[in-house]
Amino acid sequence: MEKWRRRIRSGIVRSSRIPWLRFAYRKACQLATWEVGRRLANLPGVEAVYTRHSHPSFVTFAPGQSDLDLTLVLDDAAAQGATAVHACTDRLDALSRVICFVWPQDLRIVSRRELAQIEARPGAAEILSAPSGWIRIGGRDARRAGELPALESGGIFLHPEFNSWWRNVLQSHVMAPQTNLAPESMRLCFRVAMKSELHLQAGRGRLTLAAQTYLPDSDAAALFADDPKMAGLLGRLERNDFFAHDAEARKARILDRSIARAGEFYRDLPIPADAGWIVPTASRSAWLPEAHRSELRARLESAEALRAIAETIIIYPTPHWSPREYQIDLILHDGVAAEAFNDAVSSIKRTLGGRTFGIQGTYAQLTMISRSAFAHPYYLLGTPFPFLHEHLATFAETLFGPAPRIPSPPPSAERLRWCARYFLFHRFTQHYRPRYVSKDCNFCQLAAVRLYLEHGEVLTDAAQIRRAYLDAFVTQAEESRALDLLLRGGDAHPEEIAFAAALQLQSRAYEAVEALLRREGILS
């Protein structure tokens, strides 16, 4: 199924260069979107169906590349049980098998009460987005009428999604290009670079913030008006239907500039007066098996072009994740030449096999970061990983170069405010999808936040979190099995664990965290 899906999308991308075919594809997508909205809205308990960021009626909707970011609103009674929720996820799974621009991982489900909370704090659940900008495609409008609060803009660089475009999406695309697109197609790279810059400009306070339904391609010139290098890389792509003969080299240069732009943002961002840093010890970490350490060193040593641009390379276990995998942060020298960066990207593909690569039965993922970004106390708070400051201080081991300075954890009051925003983001993404799997948003993170708010514990290791959560909050055998499913640990078999049991345990965790945040007076 996935093989044919990739072929279909690739064929659509290539043939969309013919204007009348592109028009026909968009009309077909509009009809399919109407059918998706109708089928989902007809399910019991569903009040409304929305698409958040794009719609095939927009001229910038790209058939074969653009997807529907769906949100379903359930009435509060239906959201209390698993029947309606399970019916929604099953229906969307079925639709995704016949409609190639519907992806289950893009689905969000909220209750009517949760929608009201999101409306009260626009921009918290999803960065630079608010329900007022959603497009209804099914059911009756569940949003409140009248004037609503303005989009949340203060401290937007502390949102868990702030660094997501340049740090994750763009690096995955450039270092391991998606197989479902024509390799010479530049549109995904173009769009991600724009969205990354939009976040940075919003963080600088240069934008008049409004709920973004869809960022027009034509905004690229204005976004990069002060960056002639990036403007030159993106220029003329729209007129060429986003195809380029030098696509791979141009993608690498766009990634280089995007990382540099993020570095410039953090270089200019004021450092809080109470900031502090630590330097981890140079000793070898007990958690990293020697066989893995030796192989990683050997593979990185063979990637000479990669080491040439790195000031420091550190490794640590992926936080809140089981089974254990590795995160490798490559902290760049200042002022890396474009040719050297291109050579490094080629080396990653050739020597490592891509950004994510196998290592003796597990996996490692490499991320490039500018030195000024990594050293800034707010950088780690712009990622979706709770307690990442402590995680790095505890687990980071330097593979090459001098040990980096790691920012100290934020003050407790600032961390509580971050937890409130993180809770709304996490619940919007994860709540009604207990079998959703993602390193960026998972139950283990929620469990860690609950343990911190209730007991003051700071834990990032999945095994430690499981033991602590089991001891503190789980009393029945079925709940223990559901916990293993949610944490992706133990011997959990999804087919043997009831969807209802997993959803109930996850819902109780969200309710507990919400109550704790209300008790602290930081969530209304």
List where the protein language model places each region.
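Generic "edge-of-domain/loop-turn" microfeature
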Residues: 56, 77-79, 114-116, 260-264, ...
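Active-site nucleotide-donor binding segment shared across nucleotidyl transfer reactions
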Residues: 37-68, 73-80, 297-326, 332-339
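Broad structural signal for hydrophobic residues in well-ordered alpha-helices, predominantly aliphatic
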Residues: 39-40, 95, 220, 469
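Short, solvent-exposed secondary-structure capping/transition elements
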Residues: 79-83, 198-206, 339
